[in-house]
């Protein structure tokens, strides 16, 4: 600091312009703050009018409770709010806004006009302010019950900020995304958007499951709803509901991911980690899952006052939230079988909310214990699937046979029978059924193409199966079950490896010693910042022990759990399954193909191979007719 500089108070205008840098980044930021105020006022319809991407004009009009004439000037003051009164109120805040600085920040960098009327008032009142003149002017106006806010010429008095704005289309895309997120968060509110005089979006209130599904489809696209699983699970004060996209509906970018905590759209690394972990075994490398999920918990269980934009949150029991999210999504994705993917629901049904072990139970250190082994869970009998075509409808039922997990030694030879010559009796045993009611989801094999693909016929049409990919997933799941039932054996190191850590990392290792031991590790603390690795899992004897332990400790300290060891083990099991699976160009007889189809129907995650590629696809009669221009 130079000797001639003196400490002085900043002017209110300059202070607000500096604060606006945190709150007002672009027109989308303004829209977010104004829309959240409308929702907090109890609005049931919100109209948004935009010109030039929101830079020239952004007008938000609602039918909420309105603001009294006396409170209008105060609404533009910094840290003035009706949401909280004391610090303790932050622990239970449910409103989207509460900091009381958005309108002051916006009015400091734009020309703002706010008109409002309460239900008890005989007339409306209007207040105007500009960035260079912070003194609001209040006057009577005509307006129905509710509030309208006009923001014109954004950043007109801060040219440096305006230079950083992107093209009109880019800014409008960001603004539209804000509206989409809020429209997903509040199904009970109608949203209507116009840009340069043209209607862009019109979403009416959605009060039932069908209307909600229709709104999600309008925002995320009909393809998402056709490839999404509805979930609704509640346990230990946490409820997760919404829709998760099937792994086959993944995206190259993370642009179709919506997560809400108590109705607030958030981007949280703990949530992202739990979702990524749940999709780990079924998503192709470099692809991103799709989901619209809502987490509900007690307001005092989450801190929303982490950042001025309120995009980040902090959970009081982060470990429990992480385990609940992972367990729920993992179970939902594991339960997807071919019959679930054949019938795309026209409307989203309400699901029962499983409790206890139905939703997945977790041990002391976060590992998941299913109610029964993965491959021992029989599917419910008499599953019905409709044709879904335009012709005469029909239904068929199929009761799959529960498969039994095999010991690890036997798992490598699961399909040894594939390589034996078939007799006439075996062929007769797989004869096609005489009635449609006996057709299983993946149907019955017709032929093999180039020794790679199985062609089968089911009630919908033609099924094509990647033989090696499907068998690889079956082998992989059985190896995982066998490993879980038999446990992990440790491999003592001839010369223990010494690991230099921080004291915090060493404390974490000591705290989780039993967890490491169950996974085949033996760690010994030699000093405040020194650790000895004496034993590692036998399957990971080729791994770099020091690096693996350090990475696991980093995860444990950040998330309270780690999937790195399991990821290494799964990679090895996947390699074993790949080598043990039936190879391409291996000619299979019809009974062998049918045996593979039946096992696919009884295996978790059989829709994707270990690398996330699809294992089968369906072509209905309508699809085939289009290829030959039939019916035109």
UniProtKB/Swiss-Prot annotation:
UniProt record, GO biological process: mismatch repair
Keywords for this protein: DNA damage, DNA repair
Pfam families: DNA_mis_repair, HATPase_c_3, MutL_C
Listed InterPro entries: DNA_mismatch_repair_CS (IPR014762), DNA_mismatch_repair_MutL (IPR020667), DNA_mismatch_S5_2-like (IPR013507), HATPase_C_sf (IPR036890), MutL/Mlh/PMS (IPR002099), MutL/Mlh/Pms-like (IPR038973), MutL_C (IPR014790), MutL_C_dimsub (IPR042120)
Molecular function GO terms recorded: ATP binding; ATP hydrolysis activity; ATP-dependent DNA damage sensor activity; mismatched DNA binding
Cellular component annotations (GO), alphabetically ordered: mismatch repair complex
Domain of life: Bacteria
PROSITE patterns reported for this sequence: DNA_MISMATCH_REPAIR_1 (PS00058)
CDD domains: HATPase_MutL-MLH-PMS-like, MutL_Trans_MutL
Family, per entry: Belongs to the DNA mismatch repair MutL/HexB family.
Job of this protein: This protein is involved in the repair of mismatches in DNA. It is required for dam-dependent methyl-directed DNA mismatch repair. May act as a 'molecular matchmaker', a protein that promotes the formation of a stable complex between two or more DNA-binding proteins in an ATP-dependent manner without itself being part of a final effector complex.
Record-given protein name: DNA mismatch repair protein MutL
Gene: mutL
């Amino acid at each position: 600091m130079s000797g001639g500089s003196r400490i002085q108070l900043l002017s209110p205008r300059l202070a607000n312009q500096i604060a606006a840098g945190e709150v007002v980044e672009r027109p989308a930021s303004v829209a977010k703050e104004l829309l959240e105020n409308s929702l907090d006022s109890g609005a049931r319809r919100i109209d948004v009018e935009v010109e030039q991407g929101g830079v020239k004009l952004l007008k938000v009009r609602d039918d909420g409770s309105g603001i009294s004439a006396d409170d209008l000037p105060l609404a533009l003051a910094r840290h003035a709010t009706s949401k909280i009164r004391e610090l303790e109120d932050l622990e239970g805040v449910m409103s989207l806004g509460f900091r009381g600085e958005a309108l002051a920040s916006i009015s400091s960098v734009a020309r703002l006009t706010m008109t409002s009327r309460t239900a008890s008032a005989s007339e409306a009142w209007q207040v105007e302010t500009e960035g260079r003149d912070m003194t609001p002017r209040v006057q009577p106006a005509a307006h129905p019950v509710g509030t309208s806010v006009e923001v014109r010429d954004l950043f007109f008095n801060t040219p440096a900020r305006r230079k950083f704005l992107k093209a009109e289309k880019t800014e409008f895309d960001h603004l539209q995304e804000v509206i989409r997120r809020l429209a997903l968060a509040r199904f009970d509110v109608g949203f209507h958007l116009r840009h340069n005089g043209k209607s862009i979006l019109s979403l009416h209130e959605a009060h039932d499951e069908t209307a909600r599904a229709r709104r999600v489809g309008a925002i995320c696209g009909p393809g998402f709803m056709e490839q999404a699983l509805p979930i609704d699970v509640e346990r230990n004060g946490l409820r997760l509901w919404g829709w998760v996209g099937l792994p086959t509906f993944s995206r190259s970018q993370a642009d179709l991911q919506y997560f809400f905590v108590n109705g607030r759209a958030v981007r949280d690394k703990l949530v992202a980690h739990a979702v990524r972990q749940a999709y780990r075994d079924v998503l192709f490398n470099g692809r991103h899952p799709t989901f619209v999920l809502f987490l509900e918990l007690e307001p005092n269980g989450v801190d929303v006052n982490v950042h001025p934009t309120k995009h980040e949150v902090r959970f009081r029991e982060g470990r429990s939230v992480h385990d609940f999210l992972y367990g729920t999504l993992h179970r939902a994705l594991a339960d997807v079988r071919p019959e679930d993917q054949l019938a795309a629901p026209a409307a989203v049904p309400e699901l029962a909310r499983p409790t206890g072990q139905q939703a997945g139970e977790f041990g002391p250190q976060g590992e998941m214990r299913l109610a029964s082994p993965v491959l021992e869970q029989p599917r419910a009998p008499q599953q019905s699937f409709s044709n879904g075509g335009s012709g005469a409808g029909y239904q068929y039922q199929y009761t799959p046979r529960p498969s039994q997990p095999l010991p690890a030694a036997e798992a490598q030879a699961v399909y040894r029978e594939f390589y034996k010559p078939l007799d006439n009796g075996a062929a007769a045993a797989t004869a096609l059924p005489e009635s449609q009611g006996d057709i299983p989801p993946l149907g019955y094999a017709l032929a093999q193409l180039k020794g790679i693909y199985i062609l089968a016929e089911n009630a919908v049409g033609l099924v094509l199966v990647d033989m090696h990919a499907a068998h690889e997933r079956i082998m992989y799941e059985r190896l995982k079950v066998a490993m879980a039932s038999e446990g992990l054996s440790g491999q003592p190191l001839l010369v223990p490896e010494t690991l230099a850590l921080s004291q915090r990392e060493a404390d974490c290792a000591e705290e989780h010693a039993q967890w490491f031991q169950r996974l085949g590790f033996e760690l010994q603390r030699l000093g405040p910042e020194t650790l000895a690795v004496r034993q590692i899992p036998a399957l990971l004897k080729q791994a770099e022990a020091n690096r693996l332990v350090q990475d696991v400790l980093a995860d444990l300290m950040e998330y309270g759990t780690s999937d790195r060891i399991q990821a290494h083990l799964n990679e090895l099991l996947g390699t074993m399954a790949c080598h043990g699976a039936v190879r391409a160009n291996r000619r299979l007889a019809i009974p062998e193909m049918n045996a593979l189809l039946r096992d696919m129907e009884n295996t978790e995650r059989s829709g994707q191979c270990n690398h996330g590629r699809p294992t089968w696809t369906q072509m209905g009669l309508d699809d085939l007719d289009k290829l030959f221009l039939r019916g035109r």
